[in-house]
């Protein structure tokens, strides 16, 4: 059972469905406390803990605001299972969006100890415990920080003088006439009016981007009630000018524990998040690519007139690409609510025996709306004095995608822990039932003439609509036995019996056992008496079975697939 006392977490480590003393661990478990987590300030929790746990590998694959796509693995394997406050959550993206100021500890199960989570534990497990209140006067804390980011290295590109010189040399070396005359080359080299070098990167990107995070929290408690609450805000800006790409996140958390009677304790944990990402229609990579591909002799505006974006020969004008009002934009938003209600009862007259029931309800609402606007770029005729328009992104397009999901998880847990002289034994049994539902719908329409970004204002012909729903269900029985003799000799046996909706009725259940032993050599007299500088030396061994809930569901049903195209007749497909 996860204890509500924050102080107790100082010398214990959160493991699957419980806590254990550090010195009693028999598995490979890394642990980070709150001070280690918040020491590094970053928009993503993954970046904040990078490099702080042995065997934990985190590779940031995308620095774009709102893209929580860091690759997280334990000991080089695949993505681990993520457990937040005792509940299996939606994976790496949700973990990375957590407010670091709300976290008390993170445990990393690296070996067979992860088997207690059964299916989907093949790559280890990451267990997050959020802050709980502690006895004491109310404490109000305000944390705020501002960060500045900049590219590690930006490739240096040729300017107009260098570019034209190399173009001329390339043509001459190939036995062809020079690309431009000597007089024109001199003008490019001197930067004469109309022959200025254009740095497209500087025209589109700032040298630095800003980040801001703040959290206001309140915590405290008495012998009857303990509480922790917080509100957080974070923003992450990109290098793009005009604030074309931004991410904003609002979070709240409320963890309250109430001692109803001497033996009965209730807890209510609430967590919520609302975050939005605003970006141009064009992907960040395409914008960056445009600043690299187009030559430095092409100006942003035709005839240097800011009313006319210049028409580029290779890829679209990057300045037009980041102008959301002109070329289109996209907005992504998430609404997430996590609720957890628990009752814990210490059984009278049976010392060390307690039972706990937990009900979890999570809700997530996702929306994505993107508008591609048709736009024009121009070429200026020096002799005619006229602007010739070229169309791009026609016809205009609107995409509107929605997804709604909910999770219901019920856990019943029995714990027994008792010390008899030099012997300490522990036993845990958990029954868990988890159910998840989701539905989604995607719509797309094109415009004959763009007015406002709503599907009803676009044409009905050539529209695309898709959608579906899913229903998942899981049952689990979990057991664990621990033994400790004099704090020297340690043993643990654990097992999980998992059932998944994904497979055929006769093959839905799987058994995941694990065993581990430990020997605290530092507690032996021959170490204590001769090597006083050794305070904790342990030899341990673990083995277990883990799995992966892989594959599409209901593949055991017979089905058929028609060949593409043609018609279906009574005798077959033609």
Describe the predicted segments one by one.
Residues 284, 299-301, 379-380, 492:
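Core alpha/beta catalytic barrel or barrel-like domain that forms the active/cofactor pocket
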Residues 1-253, 265-267:
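Short, small/polar-rich motifs associated with maturation and membrane association
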Residues 104-105, 112-163, 249, 351, ...:
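N-terminal start-of-domain structural block
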Residues 37, 212, 255-264, 269-274, ...:
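Extracellular/periplasmic, surface-exposed regions of secreted and cell-surface proteins
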Residues 279:
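Glycine-rich, Lys/Arg-enriched anion-binding loops that position phosphate/diphosphate groups
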Residues 8, 22, 136, 150-152, ...:
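Residue-level signal for secondary-structure boundary sites
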């Amino acid at each position: 059972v996860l204890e509500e006392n924050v102080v107790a977490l100082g010398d214990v480590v959160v493991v699957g469905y419980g806590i254990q003393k550090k010195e009693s661990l028999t598995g490979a478990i890394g642990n980070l406390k709150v001070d280690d987590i918040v020491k590094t300030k970053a928009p993503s929790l993954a970046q904040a803990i990078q490099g702080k746990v042995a065997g934990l590998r985190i590779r940031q694959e995308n620095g774009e605001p709102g893209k929580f796509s860091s690759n997280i693995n334990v000991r080089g394997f695949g993505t681990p299972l993520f457990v937040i406050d005792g509940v299996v959550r939606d994976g790496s993206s949700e973990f990375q969006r957590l407010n670091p100021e709300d976290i008390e500890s993170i445990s990393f199960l690296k070996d067979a100890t992860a088997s207690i989570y059964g299916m989907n534990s093949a790559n280890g497990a990451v267990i997050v415990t959020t802050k709980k209140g502690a006895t004491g006067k109310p404490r109000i804390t305000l944390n705020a920080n501002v960060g500045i980011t900049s590219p590690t290295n930006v490739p240096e590109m040729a300017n107009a003088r260098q570019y034209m010189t190399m173009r001329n040399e390339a043509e001459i070396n190939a036995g062809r006439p020079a690309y431009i005359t000597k007089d024109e080359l001199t003008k490019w080299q001197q930067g004469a009016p109309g022959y200025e070098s254009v740095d497209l990167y500087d025209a589109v990107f700032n040298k630095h981007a800003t980040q801001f995070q703040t959290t206001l929290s309140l915590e405290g408690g008495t012998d009857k009630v303990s509480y922790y609450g917080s509100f957080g805000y974070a923003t992450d800006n990109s290098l793009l000018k005009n604030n074309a790409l931004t991410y904003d996140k609002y979070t709240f958390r409320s963890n309250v524990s109430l001692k109803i009677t001497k033996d009965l304790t209730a807890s209510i944990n609430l967590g919520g998040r609302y975050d939005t990402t605003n970006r141009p229609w064009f992907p960040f990579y395409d914008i960056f690519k445009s600043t690299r591909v187009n030559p430095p002799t092409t100006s942003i505006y035709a005839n240097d007139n800011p009313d006319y974006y210049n028409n580029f020969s290779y890829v679209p004008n990057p300045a037009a690409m980041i102008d959301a009002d002109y070329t289109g934009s996209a907005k992504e938003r998430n609404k997430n609510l996590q609720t957890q209600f628990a009752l814990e009862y210490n059984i009278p007259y049976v010392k060390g025996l307690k039972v706990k029931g937990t009900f979890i309800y999570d809700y997530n609402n996702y929306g994505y709306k993107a508008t591609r606007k048709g736009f024009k770029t121009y070429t200026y005729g020096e002799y005619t004095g006229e602007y010739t328009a070229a169309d791009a992104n026609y016809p205009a397009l609107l995409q509107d995608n929605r997804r709604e999901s909910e999770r219901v998880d019920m856990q019943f847990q029995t714990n027994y822990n008792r010390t008899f002289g030099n012997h300490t034994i522990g036993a845990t049994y958990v029954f868990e039932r988890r159910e998840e539902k989701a539905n989604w719908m995607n719509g797309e329409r094109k415009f004959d003439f763009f007015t406002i970004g709503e599907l009803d204002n676009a044409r009905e012909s050539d529209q695309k609509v898709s959608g579906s729903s899913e229903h998942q269900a899981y049952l689990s029985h979990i057991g664990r036995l621990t033994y400790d003799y004099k704090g020297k000799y340690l043993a643990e046996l654990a097992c999980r019996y998992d059932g998944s909706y994904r497979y055929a009725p006769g093959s839905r259940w799987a058994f995941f056992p694990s065993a581990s032993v430990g020997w605290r050599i530092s507690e032996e007299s021959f170490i204590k008496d001769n090597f006083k500088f050794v305070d904790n030396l342990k030899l341990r061994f673990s083995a277990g079975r883990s799995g992966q809930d892989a594959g599409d569901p209901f593949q055991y049903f017979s089905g058929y697939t028609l060949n593409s195209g043609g018609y279906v007749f009574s005798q077959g497909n033609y």
